[in-house]
Amino acid sequence: MANNGENGRHQEVGHKSLLQSDALYQYILDTSVYPREPEPMKELREITAKHPWNIMTTSADEGQFLSMLIKLINAKNTMEIGVFTGYSSLATAMALPDDGKILAMDINRENYEIGLPVIEKAGLAHKIEFKEGPALPVLDQMIEDGKYHGSYDFIFVDADKDNYLNYHKRLIDLVKVGGLIGYDNTLWNGSVVAPPDAPLRKYVRYYRDFVLELNKALAADPRIEICQLPVGDGITLCRRIS
């Protein structure tokens, strides 16, 4: 059993690992993730670790999972809402074929430009179309245009949790039948099962109800099949079936 010091340390990284043992999570990273992590992803991960908001990044094990997923479904046309420094975008770009594409949207280009030199050095910048600004107006325009319906193989959402349901209402039309939408942080630091009086960080408490609402809505949506996994901070995969 972990001692109090270990528990304390784990709480600081708990947003990205739901495992109760730091040692077990470190074992996964040291044995299966870091030895196989491509050099560009390692470089960007280490750069991002120095950012004051580094907790916003995709964890290395989740990056590995996304890369495997992209390859398994033979994705070619993808979208990402919420980019930060681009670690998950880089993982996706490395897994896509040379003519694969990512429409990457985030409200802060400055953060993306931290990772852009790494992406460019890896020869992958041509796969990523970055749009700065809120994603909802872009999605609305795409739906209005009509030509984007059912055009995406994979969509990854790691952005403002209070808009996840608004994203879902639109993305379900843009992903193809048989395609996947991945919603990140759906276990939200484990707070989805925390009692009402639990001592939670302010931002965790604020977004918890939105995450709970999303999870309930996805479970009841007949247009998708779902699988919720305790990878990183929880990811729910939604496969469009109608």
Swiss-Prot record:
One of the GO BP terms on file: phenylpropanoid metabolic process
Residues at which S-adenosyl-L-methionine binds: 58, 80, 82-83, 88, 106, 135, 160
Keyword Protein biosynthesis: no
EC number(s) per entry: 2.1.1.104, 2.1.1.-
Entry keyword set: Cytoplasm, Lignin biosynthesis, Metal-binding, Methyltransferase, S-adenosyl-L-methionine, Transferase
Induction line: Circadian-regulation with peak levels occurring in the afternoon in flowers.
Residues binding substrate, per UniProt: 16, 158, 189
Reaction(s) this enzyme catalyzes, per UniProt: (E)-caffeoyl-CoA + S-adenosyl-L-methionine = (E)-feruloyl-CoA + S-adenosyl-L-homocysteine + H(+); (E)-5-hydroxyferuloyl-CoA + S-adenosyl-L-methionine = (E)-sinapoyl-CoA + S-adenosyl-L-homocysteine + H(+)
InterPro entries: Cation-dep_OMT, SAM-dependent_MTases_sf, SAM_O-MeTrfase
Record GO terms (molecular function): caffeoyl-CoA O-methyltransferase activity; metal ion binding
Listed pathway(s): Aromatic compound metabolism; phenylpropanoid biosynthesis
PROSITE patterns for the chain: SAM_OMT_I
Cross-referenced PANTHER family: CAFFEOYL-COA O-METHYLTRANSFERASE 3 (PTHR10509:SF94), O-METHYLTRANSFERASE-RELATED (PTHR10509)
Family: Belongs to the class I-like SAM-binding methyltransferase superfamily. Cation-dependent O-methyltransferase family. CCoAMT subfamily.
Name of the molecule in the record: Caffeoyl-CoA O-methyltransferase 2
The organism of origin for this protein: Petunia hybrida
Gene: CCOAOMT2
